[in-house]
From Swiss-Prot:
It is found in: Mitochondrion outer membrane. The keyword Iron does not apply. The lineage of its organism: Eukaryota, Metazoa, Ecdysozoa, Nematoda, Chromadorea. GO terms for cellular component: cytoplasm; SAM complex. Associates with the mitochondrial contact site and cristae organizing system (MICOS) complex (also known as MINOS or MitOS complex). The gene is mtx-1. Involved in transport of proteins into the mitochondrion. Essential for embryonic development. Disulfide bonds: none annotated. Belongs to the metaxin family. InterPro entries: Glutathione-S-Trfase_C-like (IPR010987), Glutathione-S-Trfase_C_sf (IPR036282), Metaxin1/3 (IPR017410), Metaxin_GST (IPR033468), Mito_Protein_Transport_Metaxin (IPR050931), Sam37/metaxin_N (IPR019564). Pfam families: GST_C_6, Tom37. The chain crosses the membrane at residues 282-302. GO terms for biological process: mitochondrion organization; protein transport. This is Metaxin-1 homolog.
Length: 312
């Protein structure tokens, strides 16, 4: 099998949520899958990455996480993902996966694709630099519209409220455990890692969700544990990412400075006192009276007679 994922950056083997979930799951069960870093989503049946290409046979490429987990269970490797879960634990895993998809995933989409400052500073620049022109324009527009459709018009406050609650729920479930179902990783751990790792590692000018995640030390520890055990970066990847760090720091700093400048300008504009309301009312009344009299004279409602004085 070949697993095609987006390239690595920001201390991660890939910055894409779904790519991280596929990759983490394959590594947790020591699957002999061949990982291919790619920036060619058009080769996938749905035009997105990740994609699992099964080299032997004529099987269609897989782009669905649950189908990929099923494939891993049947591959015959020594470590079988989710093999030790009871029926109740499997049901809980499914319920938790659904809960995260509806409460945490929208916030991740909003953070990277709907927040204009984050999108213009990080997301758009990263994908545009990895895709060739003019395909990058088409892909970014398509991906952004898809994200907005999935958000369904929810306002920022509602999205963040659901996400904060989801993070607190995750933190409570993890507790002091190494993984979410004890000391052995499951597909739920891969799923959660894919959601949390980009939020924790990718620098963003609007970082409200990052701040909330950082306030949950056990979730931060979980991300670091999975990264160090299952997804360590090669020396070449570390060097390449290090060379880009200053550029990203500069972009983030400039975006934050522009944000503060815009906020200061807005506050200054709001501080300018409005015209006195009494004066406006008086001027409006006088103007209305003048117009009314002029209209009445013009239509003949008021007649003005002029008498000439006869000289004796």
């Amino acid at each position: 099998m070949e697993l095609h994922i987006w390239p690595s950056d920001f201390g991660l083997p890939t910055i894409d949520v779904s790519s991280l979930q596929f990759l983490a799951c394959s590594k947790m069960c020591a699957s002999p899958v061949r990982v291919v870093q790619s920036a060619r989503p058009w080769r996938s049946p749905n035009g997105e990455l990740p994609m699992v290409a099964q080299i032997d046979g004529n099987a269609k490429p897989v782009t669905d996480f649950e189908k990929f987990v099923d494939i891993l269970k049947k591959c015959g490797q020594d470590v079988v993902i989710d093999a030790d879960l009871t029926t109740i634990e499997r049901a809980q895993l499914d319920a938790f996966s659904c809960y995260l998809h509806h409460n945490l995933y929208p916030a991740v989409l909003h953070t990277f694709w709907a927040d204009d400052l984050n999108y213009n500073t990080v997301t758009q620049y990263w994908y545009a630099s990895h895709l060739h022109f003019p395909y990058n324009l088409y892909y970014l527009e398509k991906r952004k519209k898809k994200a907005l459709r999935m958000l369904g018009g929810k306002n920022d406050t509602e999205i963040l409220k659901d996400a904060f609650m989801a993070l607190n729920t995750l933190s409570t479930k993890l507790g002091d455990n190494k993984f979410f179902c004890g000391n052995k990783p499951t597909s739920l751990d891969a799923l959660v890692f894919g959601y949390l790792a980009p939020l924790l590692r990718v620098p963003l000018p609007n970082d409200r969700l990052q701040v909330q995640l950082s306030a949950c030390p056990n979730l931060v520890r979980f991300v670091e544990t999975v990264s160090s055990i299952y997804l360590p970066l090669s020396e070449d990847e570390l060097k390449r990412q290090q060379s880009n760090r200053k550029m990203w720091q500069s972009r983030i700093s400039k975006a934050k400075a522009d944000k503060e400048a815009a906020k200061t300008t807005e506050e200054a504009a709001e501080a300018i006192p409005d015209e006195p309301p009494m004066r406006d009312a008086i001027l409006f009344t006088i103007g209305a009276l003048v117009l009314s009299v002029a209209f009445a004279i013009h239509t003949g409602l008021i007649q003005v007679s002029v008498e000439e004085e006869i000289a004796e």
